[in-house]
Amino acid sequence: MNEDNLIWIDLEMTGLNPERDRILEIATLITDNELSILSEGPVLTIYQPESQLLLMDEWNTYTHSSNGLLKEVRSSKLNECDASILVLKFLKNWVPCKSSPMCGSSVAQDRRFLLKYMSELESYFSYRYLDVSTIKELMFRWRPDLKTGLQLHKSHRALADIQESVLELKYYRKYFINCN
């Protein structure tokens, strides 16, 4: 356990509104300060009833059908509470409570869903964020020439997306922030 380790998280959801939409998948991983992946947490698919899945818009329905997530959601036996307990068990082996910012891409959106459906997990993070999307926005505005050097696949599966977020931050660190 190390208080300098970083917790990375990604959620896949039925939509963007936590008042109506639900979590479909959650994944976490741990890096050190140099962004080396130390461990990958459980990748958990959360059951949602068909009535909830029918509320998804066209983009979410197509994307989560194409990548196989909806099939896994329909056969999952886990609910949000089960998933939260399993993720916390993993995190407690690597990072003390309240010591890591929430790391990932557009993690403020993920935090809204965690607060609504997995509040104990949400409270494990510090109040801070390490949001790769913010750095991306700055790079696009200040160094648009760097856009072409990074190829992302965005499978819209939780583990693959956070692995890409770590790679993305490594790229920005090397070419945009220049601290190597």
Curated annotation (Swiss-Prot):
**Family to which the UniProt record says this protein belongs:** Belongs to the oligoribonuclease family.
User: What NCBIfam families has UniProt attached to this entry?
Assistant: PRK05359.1
Name the predominant localization: cytoplasm
Give the protein name, as stated in the record. Oligoribonuclease
The species this protein belongs to is Blochmanniella floridana
UniProt cross-references to HAMAP family, sorted A to Z: Oligoribonuclease (MF_00045)
Read off the Gene3D superfamilies from this record. Ribonuclease H-like superfamily/Ribonuclease H
Q: Which cellular component appears as one GO term in the record? A: cytoplasm
